[in-house]
């Protein structure tokens, strides 16, 4: 997803171990990548390891600059609301996404995907003029977090009601899809067994 950031990301590839140590390979990769990408660790895994399917959970964080607070240095890494947001409504609606729900209204579907997924936890926090919305689960659909945040922003702008979100999560109706901007989204953590 273009402009989405990752603080944690796993990549699987094969190489001839006898030619390079893990430390040498890490050094070479870090010199090859742009400064925005940095290899922090190399771990040997089974040949059939899949970074996408073998994880036990992923945590996404969406950054929003609080209304009335603009930090230009973070403008490419966060969402800046263009109108008033009712923060209390966002706090109220965020826990609605926890649990097992039908998320087809919160995704761009690409074929025969399982849209009945579980969000293990959500959280809201504020720090230094920033709002942090976190979503933790084993699997997410394409653009799911951006559509969930879009629904929260729509609710915070009084464009939709709580029942609209609940009906969409129950698969009863298609929510008017509003996809949040990509630059506020971070893949914050991936956990493996």
Language model regions located:
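Structured-RNA-binding interfaces characteristic of tRNA pseudouridine synthases
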Residues: 2-193
């Amino acid at each position: 997803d273009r402009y989405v950031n990752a603080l944690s990301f796993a990549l699987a590839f094969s190489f001839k171990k006898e030619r390079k140590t893990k430390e040498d390979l890490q050094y070479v990769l870090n010199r090859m990548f742009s400064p925005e990408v940095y290899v922090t660790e190399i771990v040997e895994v089974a040949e059939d390891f899949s970074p996408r399917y073998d994880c036990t959970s992923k945590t996404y964080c969406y950054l929003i600059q609080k209304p009335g607070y603009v930090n230009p240095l973070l403008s490419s890494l966060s969402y800046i609301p263009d109108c008033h947001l009712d923060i209390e409504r966002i706090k109220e609606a965020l826990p609605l996404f926890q649990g097992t729900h039908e998320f087809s209204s919160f995704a761009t579907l690409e074929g025969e995907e399982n849209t009945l997924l579980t969000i293990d936890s959500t959280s809201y926090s504020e720090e230094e003029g920033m709002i942090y919305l976190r979503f933790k689960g084993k699997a997410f659909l394409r653009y799911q977090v951006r559509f969930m945040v879009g629904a929260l922003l729509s609710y915070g702008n009084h464009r939709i009601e709580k029942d609209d979100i609940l009906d969409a999560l129950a698969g009863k109706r298609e929510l008017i899809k509003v996809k949040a901007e990509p630059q506020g989204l971070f893949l914050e953590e991936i956990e493996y067994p």
